[in-house]
Amino acid sequence: MKNSIFKCFGITKADVTSILSDIFANSEGVLITLQEEGPIVSIKIDADDSNNRVMDKTAEIFQRLNNYIYAEEDISIYEAVFRLMKLNHLTLATAESITAGNVSACFVKYNAGASQILLEGNVVYTNNAKMRMLDVPEKVLNTHTAVSVETTYDMAKGCLNKSGADIVIATTGYAG
C-alpha cells in the first residue's frame, strides 16, 4: 500500500472537506481520510496499487492547502516548531495564563532536547503574577481586563524583555 500524510493547522475539517470536495469525488482507487484533533487536521492518502495515484492526489492537496500544512509526516505541531526553531537557532519563552504552563510542557513532552530552544515558561494565572513577573501595567489590566489583546501584548513584551528569547508565546482567555 502506498500512502502519504499531511498535518494541518489553522483550518477546520469542514473547510478542508469543502476545499477538497472535487478531489474526494474523483478519488477512485485512493482512500482519503480526515481526522480532526483539536486545532490539527490530519489528511491521510492511501492507495493499494499505484504510487502515481497517491502522488497525484498528494500534489493536488498540497497545492490547495500548502498555507496550512505544517508537516508531511505524523508529528505534532510542537515537534515541527521545535525542528524549525532548532534549525534556525531560535529560542522560545512562554507567558501562559489560560494554558497554565501546558504550551511549554508540550514542547518538553514531544521533544527530547527541548532545552535547546525553550529558555523558560512563565505561568501567570493571576493579575498579580502578570504584574510581578512580566511587568504588565495594572492600568492595562484594570482598563482592558486580563483577557484582552492589550494584556496579551504586554505579557508577551514582558516575557520577551525578561527572557531574552527570540520568540515568545503568550496565552490568555476565559476558563469557563
Predicted features, each with a name:
Residues 1-39:
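Accessory alpha-helical/coil subdomains and C-terminal extensions
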Residues 8-10, 43-49:
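Short beta-strand-to-loop capping motifs
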Residues 14-17, 49-57:
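Short, conserved charged micro-motifs
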Residues 15-16, 42-45, 103-105:
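Short, solvent-exposed polar/charged micro-motifs at secondary-structure junctions
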Residues 23, 52-176:
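Short alpha-helical segments enriched in small residues
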Residues 30, 41-43, 167:
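Conserved beta-strand core positions
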Residues 37, 46, 172-174:
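Short loop/turn motifs enriched for small/polar and acidic residues
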